[in-house]
Structure formats: structure tokens, C-alpha cells
Amino acid sequence: MHRREVHVVIGAGVAGCLSAITRSRAGYQVVVLERESARSAGTYPVCTQTSNIVSENHSGAEYPFDPRSARDCLDGRIENERFFPELIYGGKTYSRIIASRSMMDDGHDIVGQCRANMRVIQSHYADRRAQDPADAVFGDPADICREIPTVPGVHDVAAAFLTPQRGMNPVLVSTVLDWELRSAGVDFREGSTVTSVTHRADGRYEVAYRGADGTPETVVADQVSLCAATAAFGMAKRLNPSIVFPKLFLALREILYVDLPDGTDKNFTCLKLEDSYGGMLSPLNNACAMIYHPPAAHIMNLVMDPETCAFPDEYVHYLAEGHPEKEKRAEWTLDRLREFYPELRRSTILGTYLKVAINTVSDSRVRRNMGVFDVRPGCTMSVLPKWTMCAVNARKEVTLALEHSVASGRLSADEARELAGHAMRPCLETLPAWAGDPQSITARAAAHAVNMNVPQVLAQRFAPPHAESASSRGTV
């Protein structure tokens, strides 16, 4: 690189963290501006918003009504398998996708839908494997999906399906990202509220922000990455008024953490389909779980203003002050899921969280990747409709950054190709000492739980699962 470029990444959710890590690995000088401040000493405040209640690395199996959603999620799952370490799963194994008996009894062939979707997943994985042998991360295509008649300890099951889908622990994800940010030498500026991003006549960008002490600051960047979730759309629109986004639906949802006083025999997520017939039980360890029941969780769904791309005032209020139905909906969720999952019989609610899910359709059963937006030369925007797509989008984003450097004469095309591969090398490729010490892992994860405002019990893990053979996932 003829001159080391300065890149500013706005936002430190999972998209922003991956943008910063991959850009820094590619040789750029990276500054992260994150609004939140750490509450635990020696940590960065990463994944403190929506990412604090994401616990599933989707394979597409939960979207049996939309093959494109299934393929998008599987693409993400493959990339994540190559990028993230085993540590993020906290001892969890493959999720169970459960077709509800009551849904079948009411005339909805959810089992048939799931079987058809398994074929979509197998076919797409076979195509990916044929295109690039490095994508064969789950073995033979015939072995990645399996139907089983039931899931012990779950009620109202018509059939269940094992796929590469796998639950992960959000505080362990933050622990890994924090380490990688530091290892990459990222300049992380917490407590920084961005006030404006302007494009300069020389092609660079001026980013104005208020520092942690309230002092106005500016940084001039060669390139900018907009990763501040829903706020990124408005930033992009101001930088490029002619940019066109798809129609965007913003769904306000409620997710719960609960305790498990009786423990659980499930070191895997149960995703019971569909809508009023089901819900998610995602144990993070033997002591707590994340739960979700769609009718109770889905509070509102608004369309983003296509002209201003402003975040709805109602959501600003609810996220800051809470929703008036928050407690009622939480009890509704717990009461309903007790009918399916006996380990919730004596559970109590540890925390109730509101999040905004972004989608390009109003139907939550469809979740397609929006990709990375090329806002203008040297400025990208990455917003995730699904956590699973984070590494796919990070690869695309760092590729666009390198292409801009080539176009600007700062890199050769050969250099860019080499740096792109280096940028996407696996996390924890060289295992640090703390990652081999269970107590150190727990301590680091607990510190991030404080930052993320989630129960510290999340820092506990299941015992490591036994290695699963291909036959344990294979088609019956």
C-alpha cells in the first residue's frame, strides 16, 4: 500500500466489528466510533444493542416457506463456519427444527414444508461445494440434513430436523471479537457519538463526533463504513440522496432470558415452528436460556420512511423507556412455552429485551440478505437482517474497500487479492492462552455480559460436545 489509508467504522455491533477487523488485517489504519461506553474495565463495548440477544447461527432450516431465505442463510452459515472459532458455541451442538403436531392437525403441512426445505439446503450446499471445495465444511451434501421422529422432552412434535444450524452464545462472540479487535490494532473510541459524515472535495470523508467527555472531535478518513444499524440508512441517504433502498420493514420484537432452576438435558436450540404453534428455547448453559414466542414477541411492524430513512419516533421511545405491554407479553411467552418445554416449569424471567429486526418484506418467515451497499466511492454500508450473514457481508465489504484502493492507485490488483484472503483468515487462528483456560473464558465473557446488559450467568458454558460424526447429522 503506497500510503496507509485511514478508515472509520461507525458502530461496534457484529457488522462493525467484522468490518474493523477485516479492514485492519488488510493493512488499513482503522478507527471505530462506538456510542456506548464499557462498564467493565479492560473491555470494549461491542455488540451491546441487538447483537446481545442473538443466539442462533442459522442454516436456513427455519425458513421452510422461502427457498431464497434458506439459501442466503446457508451461505452465511458456511462462511461463519470458516471464520468463527468453536468457542462461540459454548458447548452447544446442532439445533433441532421442530414441526408442530398441532399445526399438522389444523391442516398445515409443516412437515412437508420442512422436508422440501431440507432438499433446498442439500442442493445448495452441493452447488457451493462443487464451486469451491473449501466450502465443504459440513462434509457430504447427503449427510447435512436428517429427519428424526421426535425430540425427547419436547411436547407437540410431529417431526424434527437436524441441519448445520447451531446456537451460539452472544457473550462468547463478544469475547472473541474484543480479542480480534485488539490483536488487529484497531483504534477503538468508545463513548463517541457521530454527529455528521461529509464527503470532501478531495474524495475523503470528514467524520464529526462528540467524544466520551462531550468534546467535539473530527477525523478525516479515506474510507468510511456505516454499520450503526438502523441509523446507517439515514447517514447513507445524507451522503448520497439518490441512493435507493428496498422497502424496509422495521419490526419491534421482544426476547427473554429466563433461568432454568431444574436444569436442562438440551445442549441445543429448539426452534418449534410455526407462529402460534411454537417458539424458541435456546439454552445457553444448564442455568439459563433465551426464549421467544412469535405472537407475543411481534409487537409492531413499521415501514421506514424512504425519503429520510429516519428511525421511527415510536421506536426511539420504546427502546429508551420500554413498551407498555412488555411485562404482559413476557408472561405470555413464558406461559405458552411451558406447554412445549417442561424445563421451563419453574423458570423466572431474568431479563426482557426489545429489538428492531430489519427486513425487506413484512413476513417474518422470509429473511433475505440485503448485502453491502456501495453508498458512494469509499463509503459502504452494512446492516444485517440476520446475524448469520455477518461474515459474508464482511468479505464483500473488505473487497469493496480494496477495490477502491486499487482504483485510487494505492494498491495493485495482485496486492488486493492477497490482502482479501488475509483479511478473512479465521478468528483465534493462533489460540491465545486465555482461550485454553475455562476460568479465563468465563471471566472475560462475564465482563462482556455486563457491557451488554444481559445476565452474567450467560458466561457459563455447557461441557464441550463429543465430536459428531457425519452419520449423526446424516439423512435417514
Residue ranges and their predicted role:
Residues 5-31:
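N-terminal Rossmann-like FAD-binding beta1-loop-alpha1 element of flavoenzymes
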Residues 25-50:
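Glycine-rich FAD pyrophosphate-binding loop
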Residues 40, 211-274, 284-287, 404-408:
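Central helical "cap/lid" subdomain
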Residues 52-147:
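Dinucleotide-binding Rossmann-like beta1-alpha1 core, especially the glycine-rich loop
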Residues 88-101, 141-185, 206, 376-383:
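Helix-loop-beta segment of a Rossmann-like dinucleotide-binding subdomain
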Residues 157-223, 227-234, 390-400:
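Helical element adjacent to the flavin cofactor pocket in flavoenzyme catalytic cores
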Residues 158, 329-429:
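C-terminal catalytic lobe of FAD-dependent flavoproteins
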Residues 268-366:
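Active-site lid/adjacent beta-loop-alpha segment flanking the redox-cofactor pocket in flavoenzymes
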